[in-house]
From Swiss-Prot:
Keyword Zinc-finger part of the UniProt annotation: yes
This protein's UniProt keywords: DNA-binding, Metal-binding, Nucleus, Phosphoprotein, Repeat, Transcription, Transcription regulation, Zinc, Zinc-finger
Species of provenance: Homo sapiens
Gene3D superfamilies: Classic Zinc Finger
Broad class of the protein's primary localization: nucleus
UniProt-recorded name of the protein: Zinc finger protein 536
Known role: Transcriptional repressor that negatively regulates neuron differentiation by repressing retinoic acid-induced gene transcription. Binds and interrupts RARA from binding to retinoic acid response elements (RARE) composed of tandem 5'-AGGTCA-3' sites known as DR1-DR5. Recognizes and binds 2 copies of the core DNA sequence 5'-CCCCCA-3'.
Cellular location(s): Nucleus
Region Disordered: start-end pairs: 1-26, 47-77, 584-604, 650-739, 802-826, 856-893, 937-985, 1124-1260
Stated family: Belongs to the krueppel C2H2-type zinc-finger protein family.
Gene Ontology MF annotations: DNA-binding transcription factor activity, RNA polymerase II-specific; DNA-binding transcription repressor activity, RNA polymerase II-specific; retinoic acid-responsive element binding; RNA polymerase II cis-regulatory region sequence-specific DNA binding; zinc ion binding
Chain ranges of zinc fingers (C2H2-type): 130-152, 158-180, 274-297, 300-323, 345-367, 373-395, 631-653, 751-773, 779-801
PANTHER family: ZINC FINGER PROTEIN, ZINC FINGER PROTEIN 536
Length: 1300
């Protein structure tokens, strides 16, 4: 009973069957009560509506199963049938008297119910398609039927490795294996053995620990032996462990003893001994370590192999996987014999044996190499048949094998003594000759291919063999005379096979299509030319066959847009209509091209020239290049590693190409990218993916030539001046091209990306798109490391991240300059570049001056007059020492030129594209300056009161004419602002700190901090400027001249308030330097001695040092720091020239009156210098207090007094360089230009006496308008002469603008 339950998969611990199930047997199988019980339960489950509905008041009757569990053998048969009839709703005939024919009862009374059950069985029968031939039982799957058949045949292929038990299913045998463990270890005796084993293990571990301890303290003696029980304990433990794990119920199967120790040789122990990987114990011999591991760490050893495990479950799973599978092939019949079945199906991969073939078939799916379905064309194998079916569609679609013959049926035409096939077979005939090894008529050229195929000496792949077959062509083509080259076969000296089956032709075509890119390209070109040539043999004009060949040999293919058809154009200019099939073949032949990635093969590709009568030469480097070549897409040329990827990729090209029929096919070689010269027979395309030669499916037959690829580099990709391939190919073939084709642009062609297959209208868009694949990013940000593929990306980046740094100048660094101004500006833009780029390069060159360098002469020669040149020659940099003023400027020029060269080298070493950035910037700067000049003129004309500046004795008339002329010249050649300024200038009364590329403005009077310059200006006006205004109102001293001048300056500067504050501030400071410098030039000889002596007499009013306003001390704005010539702007207001009281701002009166000076905006600039020296300390080395530095010319404001807090000021004769915001390098070009208008201002005011120079005072405090005016970008116009407003709050006269 136990064994039967094991076979059925039932545990032996099941209780015995109920007594009523072992009653009288009906028909030798089941008891009657059991049969009734089964039928009733089936009917109740199938038809639940037959159950009686219990009343809620009454107790529900007992269920059928509860009644069935009553011992029915004690009840009469009539009561059982009545119970069944009550369930079925039928009355039982009492005449049966307990003897009932069950079949008659069911057939007669329940015919309707059984018919419904039969319908359900019919539905189940349809789903179960596999019936058992012996018992009729049906199964859904054949595998379940095969397992069921073992119950009839008695086959039990799974044998227990420890006993003679066999099982028909593997799961049953696994259950049986558990009985070995449970039957032995679950009893009490097994538990005792397990406890003894653990005890021995602990003793063994203690002994090993003592032995290690003694070995470390004392030297082990050879005669010392362990106690007898110490040696026997491990062996006993080993034996007990083995018996406990692998004991068998039958004595006839003893447990095999482990291998004797004498089998293993004693290994030479190293100095450290053998260490256990589990417990890190050391042993002298390998045997001791193995025994230790087997007893303590892996006590569960398999008796069938050398496997050992640390847990019992691991050992059981090992037996199930290893030993049951090995024994599963031994079939056993009903007689219990152990003979092996003759019908074996063994797996060739893993060796597993199966009893049925379909088992093996299902098992082979587990292995990766089980590709059973093979393609007869290309030999590719698939796992599933539908994969092969889809694969065959690829062959039919890609190869386009269509039986399109001419109007007449097959006509045999003699060619070389061989009968020809139909036009439909032309496609594969030339590929078959590729496959057959290019059979020559005399079989002489078959030496290498025949050896390759016949003897098989070279272990090459079939693709490499086909590639090597192409090598004899070049040698054959040279030996053929010209008379035999009227056809393609004559040119190749080949004879194709006469007949071939369809499958062979498909195989040849597929192999050619799957060749590596070089050989595949050759095969497709060979086929396309063959179709064009063979069309002559299949045409109607058979008597004129030879003439037709000659015509085709020198013919080109054109597309007539008026007639919308293709025509053949001969060498004499005659046109002939081209049939549709030949047009199709031309397209097929022209759709093959080489990828631009295969650089090693670029120099070795020599193909057909432009004419069809040229020789065919294939110059390959050798078979070594054919190995491991990727596969190329025939449509777009994209390269893939496997052919399967090409098939998947080909779905992209299945959509219809619009405009393909509207294009122009010029020549059959056009797609190979041939050049315009006859000598160039190479098709080596540009290795740059952005070149125009990568356009594949353009519809016009190709991309540009090598000579025409320059079109892609121009900003106008559709320029008609660019040469295209069709025109060049037509010229080389001797065909006169129509004017319509010459004038056409490539914009109508469809350009395809060779990487992703996207289509573009122009080559320019394709070139921009290709940068995504190539990683090219030509548009680089001048402020950071960002680079973009398109100009729009860089524009967005600059707008997003560097808006405050952009000074409104220049295009992007990667943009090509405008073509209209390239020639004009090429000779005038040599050393100008963006100031932020020059900032890092020219920092640290304190002595450089662009005016002394030869490079600046390019500007002065075209702009300045001879008088200006002489005036400029006398002008020196403010950094030149006083002793250098007496000499010439030639040594200074050479010095500056060397420093400019050094700065240029530093720029080039930093990766700055000097010429490109220079040209692009200057082109845009000229246009912006012209536009700005026009706007300034309109604003100046609209504001007449600001234009009037009163002079003395009509002295303003003479400079006005020259200034207007000079202003027009300056507008065309406006110099670049090279002033070096910090990233974010500070407002007067605030400091700037840069954190995380953000400029933070901090108020000097309180703890207010903001990143917005406008908010800081509002804060200063609301909280701090109002106090100064109230304090100033208490004094109550005003001057009408200054009030009117300040109102005029407000009106002049009100339209010019813009957000670009850095540029305006730097230009104002530069103009301050230039004005002071020109004053120094006129006063040099008079004041040199006085400056050296350090005398203050005649320069500064004594009251100048007593400055009462604390507010202006905070800002460092000293209102008295205005130049001479102030009285000339207000002659009517201050005729006596008396000075004001001490409450007013003191007067600065220099010795001479040869120059005018700046207004109170220069005071604001000086306050900027003070703030920058306080907050940033950028140029501390420029603050000099040595006495000899007092001899420098008047060029800038002093920084010593401003850094001291404003208690005292140096005189204007002791000028120091303004280094807070402007470096000497940036000042130099500004001085050269801003001083042009000031050079003419010497004579009108030269004769004025000193008392006529009215004093200047600045009583009004700084308001919001003056703060924003200091940062206005259009403030540059007033100082450069681009506007006609005075913009002076101190009534300072600008002689170059007075006449406007």
């Amino acid at each position: 009973m136990e064994e039967a339950s094991l076979c059925l998969g039932v545990s032996s611990a099941e209780p015995e069957a109920e007594p009523h199930l072992s009653g009288p047997v009906l028909n030798g199988q089941y008891a009657m009560s059991q049969k009734l019980h089964q039928i009733t339960s089936q009917l109740s489950h199938a038809f639940p509506e037959l159950h009686p509905r219990p009343n809620p008041e009454e107790k529900p009757p007992a269920s059928l199963e509860e009644k069935a569990h009553v011992p029915m053998s004690g009840q009469p048969m009539g009561s059982q049938m009545a119970l069944l009839a009550n369930q079925l709703g039928r009355e039982v005939d009492t005449s049966l008297n307990g003897r009932v024919d069950l079949q008659q009862f069911l057939n007669g009374q329940n015919l309707g119910i059984m018919s419904q059950m039969s319908d359900i069985e019919d539905d189940a029968r349809k789903n179960r398609k596999y019936p058992c031939p012996l018992c009729g039982k049906r199964f859904r799957f054949n595998s379940i039927l095969s397992l069921h058949m073992r119950t009839h045949t008695g086959e039990k292929p799974f044998k227990c490795p420890y006993c003679d038990h066999r099982a028909a299913q593997k799961g049953n045998l696994k259950i049986h294996l558990r009985t070995h463990k449970l039957g032995n270890l679950g009893k009490g005796r097994g538990r005792v053995r397990e406890e003894n084993r653990l005890l021995h293990e602990l003793e063994e571990r203690a002994i090993l620990r003592d032995k290690q301890l003694k070995g470390s303290l004392l030297q082990p003696r050879p005669d010392l032996k362990p106690p007898p029980h110490a040696q026997q304990a491990p062996l006993a433990a080993c034996t007990l462990a083995l018996q406990a794990n692998h004991s068998v119920p039958d004595v006839a199967h003893p447990v095999p003893s482990p291998k004797p120790a004498s089998v293993q040789e004693d290994a030479v122990a190293p100095a450290a001994g053998f260490r256990c990987t589990f417990c890190k114990g050391k042993f002298k011999k390998r045997e001791e370590l193995d025994r230790h591991i087997r007893i303590l760490h892996k006590p569960y050893k398999c008796t069938l192999c050398d496997f050992a495990a640390s847990q019992e479950e691991e050992l059981i799973s090992h037996v199930e996987k290893a030993h049951i599978t090995a024994e599963s092939a031994q079939g056993q019949g009903p007689n219990g014999g152990g003979e092996q079945s003759a019908n074996e199906f063994r797996c060739e991969v893993c060796g597993q044996v199966f009893s049925q073939a379909w088992f093996l078939k299902g098992h082979m799916r587990k292995h990766k190499d089980s590709f059973e379905h093979c393609c007869q064309i290309c030999g590719r194998r698939f796992k599933e048949p539908w994969f092969l079916k889809n694969h065959m569609k690829v062959h039919l679609n890609k190869l386009s094998v269509k039986n399109k013959s001419p109007s007449d049926p097959e006509v045999p035409v003699p060619m070389g003594g061989m009968s020809q096939e139909a036009h439909a077979n032309l496609y594969s005939r030339y590929l078959s000759c590729l496959q057959s090894g290019f059979m020559t008529p005399d079989k002489a050229g078959l030496s290498e291919p025949s050896q390759l195929y016949g003897k098989g000496e070279l272990p090459m792949k079939e693709k490499e063999a086909l590639g090597k077959l192409l090598s004899p062509i070049s040698s054959m083509a040279h030996g053929v005379p010209e008379g035999d080259k009227h056809s393609l076969l004559g040119c190749l000296n080949l004879v194709p096979p006469l007949k071939s089956s369809c499958i062979e032709r498909l195989q040849a075509a597929a192999k050619a299509a799957e060749m590596d890119p070089v050989n595949s390209y050759q095969a497709w070109q060979l086929m396309a030319r063959g179709m064009a040539m063979e069309h002559g043999f299949l045409s109607k004009e058979h008597p004129l066959q030879r003439n037709h060949e000659d015509t085709l040999a020198n013919a080109g293919v054109l597309f007539d847009k008026e007639k919308r058809e293709y025509v053949l154009v001969g060498a004499d200019g005659s046109k002939q209509k081209m049939p549709a099939d030949l047009v199709h073949s031309t397209k097929v032949g022209s759709q093959r091209d080489l990828p631009s990635k295969l650089d090693p093969l670029e120099s070795s590709r020599d193909f057909l020239s432009h004419g069809l009568n040229q020789t065919l030469e294939y110059n390959l480097q050798g078979p070594g290049n054919m190995k491991e070549k990727p596969t190329e897409c025939p449509d777009c040329g994209r390269v893939f590693r496997t052919y399967h990827q090409v098939v998947v990729h080909s779905r992209v090209h299945k959509r219809d190409r619009k405009g393909e029929e509207d294009g122009l096919h010029v020549g059959l070689d056009e797609r190979r990218g041939s050049g315009s010269d006859q000598e160039s027979q190479s098709v080596s395309r540009s290795t740059t993916p952005g070149s125009s030669n990568v356009t594949e499916e353009s519809g016009v037959g190709g991309g540009l030539s090598q000579t025409g690829s320059a079109q892609e580099d121009s900003p106008h990709p559709s320029s008609p001046s660019s040469s295209d391939i069709g025109e060049e190919a037509g010229r080389s073939a001797g065909v006169q091209q129509p004017a319509l084709l010459r004038d056409r642009s490539l914009g109508s062609a469809m350009k395809d990306c060779p990487y992703c297959g996207k289509t573009f209208r122009t080559s320019h868009h394709l070139k921009v798109h290709l940068r995504i694949h190539t990683g090219e990013k030509p548009y680089k940000c001048p402020h950071c490391d960002y680079a973009g593929t398109q100009s729009a990306s860089l524009k967005y980046h600059l707008e997003r991240h560097h808006r405050e740094r952009q000074n409104g100048a220049g295009p992007l660094s990667g943009q090509p300059p405008n073509q209209d101004h390239k020639d004009e500006m090429s000779s005038k833009a040599s050393l100008f570049i963006r100031p932020d780029i020059l900032r890092g390069a020219f920092k640290g060159l304190p002595g450089i001056d662009f005016r002394g360098g030869p490079a600046s002469q390019q500007w002065t020669s075209g702009v300045l007059s001879s008088g200006d040149h002489s005036g400029q020659a006398t002008g020196m940099s403010s950094e030149v020492p006083s002793d250098a003023l007496k000499g010439t400027d030639l040594p200074s020029k050479s010095t500056h030129f060397s420093e400019i060269g050094r700065a240029y080298q530093s720029i080039v070493s930093n990766g700055v594209n000097f010429q490109g950035s220079l040209q692009a910037f200057m082109d845009s700067f000229v246009l912006s300056s012209l536009k700005k000049e026009k706007d300034m003129k309109d604003k100046a004309l609209a504001d007449p009161p600001s234009m009037k500046v009163h002079g003395v004795d009509g002295g303003e008339e003479k400079p006005s004419g020259k200034s207007s002329q000079r202003k027009s010249e300056k507008s065309q050649y406006e110099p670049l602002d090279l002033s070096v300024r910090p990233d974010a200038a500070s407002l007067p009364g605030s400091s700037v700190t840069v954190q995380d590329s953000i400029a933070w403005h901090g108020c000097l009077f309180c703890a207010f901090t903001t990143s917005s310059m406008e908010l800081m200006a509002l804060h200063l006006q609301a909280n701090h400027l109002g106090k100064a205004k109230r304090k100033d109102n208490t004094i109550g001293v005003t001057v009408n001249c200054k009030d009117q001048a300040r109102e005029a300056s407000k009106m002049a500067l009100l339209p010019s308030l813009q957000s670009n504050k850095d540029l305006g501030l730097s230009n104002m400071i530069s103009s301050l330097d230039s004005a002071s410098e020109k004053m120094a030039q006129g006063q040099l000889k008079e004041t040199l001695g006085e400056q050296k002596s350090g005398a203050w007499t005649g320069h500064v009013d004594p009251a100048f040092c007593n400055f009462p306003s604390d507010f202006y001390k905070q800002f460092g704005v000293y209102p008295g720091m205005v130049g001479s010539g102030a009285s000339s702007s207000c002659p009517n207001k201050e005729p006596d020239g008396k000075a004001h009281s001490e409450e007013d701002v003191p007067i600065l009166i220099p010795e001479t009156t040869s120059k005018n000076t700046t207004d109170d905006l220069s005071d604001i600039a000086s306050s900027e210098d003070m703030d920058s020296s306080k907050g940033e300390n950028n140029d501390e080395e420029d603050v000099e207090t040595e006495p000899e530095m007092m001899t420098k010319p008047l060029s800038a404001l002093s920084k010593d007094s401003s850094s001291d807090g404003g208690d005292s000021l140096q005189p204007t004769g002791t000028s120091q360089p303004v280094q807070g915001l402007v470096s000497p390098l940036s000042q130099a070009p500004e001085k050269q230009w801003h001083s042009q208008g000031l050079l003419q201002a010497q004579d009108p005011l030269a004769g004025l006496p000193k008392p006529e120079r009215g004093p200047q005072s600045l009583d009004k405090p700084m308001n919001m308008l003056s703060v924003l005016r200091a940062y206005s970008s259009d403030g540059l116009a007033a100082f450069n002469g681009l506007a006609s407003s005075t913009a002076n709050s101190g009534c300072i006269k600008r002689p170059d603008l007075c006449g406007k």
